[in-house]
Amino acid sequence: MGAPMTEAAATSGVLVEACVDSVESAVAAEQGGAGRVELCDNLIEGGTTPSAGAILECRERLRIPVFVMIRPRGGDFLYSDVEFEVMRRDIAVAKELGAHGVVFGILRRDGSVDVERTRVLVEEARPLAVTFHRAFDVCRDPVEALEALIALGIERVLTSGQAAKAEEGIPTIAALVRQGG
């Protein structure tokens, strides 16, 4: 169910993903050469789940894959039972509307990946692609977290190497890439 890459992405060998918070930004990202968009709302809050209308408009207007942020609110990545159920429903809606992937992250109070809840969301998201988002950057042990995510079958991790900027996290990112194979 993949969408074609843009010419720029196909010729450079590098897939550029743009994080966008509107349909207009998604269209501009595709026109600018992005090979995939991560559709969010409320980027000021670090990104939250976009509306069904925004997902549908992006799917209808774009030729590139649309990955949908699944995050019921800004703030930390510790979710109540009600928020977790909202995330499950939002994944079902994203699938129904034709998203190519979903992006989420759930942690436990001790700073580790909430493996049980993440497993449920991964299972419900399939066959969509799954990305674990920047919750990874506040986990207590990135090596342990990556092993947990690999075991869960998650294909992508969005990280700045636990630094404020990706440039500052390059050593950690490089180590994680080696670990992930």
Predicted regions and their residues:
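A short, Lys/Arg-enriched amphipathic alpha-helix followed by its capping loop at the start of a domain
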Residues: 12, 16, 28-35
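Structural motif
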Residues: 32, 61, 97-98, 151-153, ...
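Active-site-adjacent beta->alpha loops and helix N-cap segments on the catalytic face
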Residues: 23-24, 43-67, 81-89, 106-126, ...
